[in-house]
Amino acid sequence: VMSSGKILCSTGALLLYGGDYRLLEPLSKQLRCDGFEFMMDCPYYQEMEALKRFLQESGLYIPVVHCEKSIGENISTGKEAQWADAYEKFEMNCDIAQSIGAKMIVVHLWDGLTSDSNFQNNIAGYPRLNQIAQRYGLDLLVENVVCSVENPMKHFCELNETYPNVHFVFDTKMAAFHGQIDLLYESEYEWLWRRKQIRHFHVNDYAGGYMDWGNLRSLPIGKGKIDFKRFFDFVKKIGYDDFFTVEATAHNGAGVVDVDMLNGQFAYIRASL
């Protein structure tokens, strides 16, 4: 039986982009998750000290921080000024993670319009990010972000060839977008879990077809096509004992949060473990 305390809710599921993070306190009292994965958004750079103070004083359990997404996009471009910006911002993300006692930091190593079209830049950008993360006592996790040119599993393999100690977060939706969810169960990729290189899972459903950009949103488990019974049977079988984060958008455009839907997700995951 897995130890408890492993089910997290992404704050990105709760707040509009750059939304009022103070809403997390009242929401946390209604949500039956074990903790949160804090999603860093661009507007928060303007109020880092206030954000840090709020998160520290709130007492929210936040073992994972998800980096703001422009970092990967800047690294993809390969331009010096944008690299400098990426590292500076990444350090701010690490600083906030360390100050609230987080242990892991998730990064989109490639992102945005550039995506993985210059993947040599993303490979080259990784070590500096990892050095910064280590300085802050954080485990850096590279996510299997959707790609416009190749596919995330190919990039995981390339990263692993260059940096055999690289760690990953595996997002079920991102994998399904590329038709790669079943690769997780194949012997060719068992190094990912045998060597404990997957340190974290994002559990989101996906309703689209292969590389179906119009259907990229993260759906609640059961609202898409992913076989989650097989997924949870597998993670139990391999003895995975770390975090799962629910990211399915739970707010409507007006910012009203569907607490019941999220609590249903947490209950489903708990019952599956």
Tell me the role of every PLM-derived stretch.
Residues A50-G59, G125-R135, E188-L192, R230-F234:
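Catalytic-core regions built around general acid/base machinery
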Residues D34, Y61, K103, D139, ...:
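Residue-level detector of anion-binding/catalytic polar loops
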Residues V1-M92, Q98, Q134, H167, ...:
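N-terminal pre-domain/capping segments
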Residues G12-L14, M39-P43, C67-S70, W110-G112, ...:
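Active-site beta-loop-alpha junctions enriched in small/polar residues
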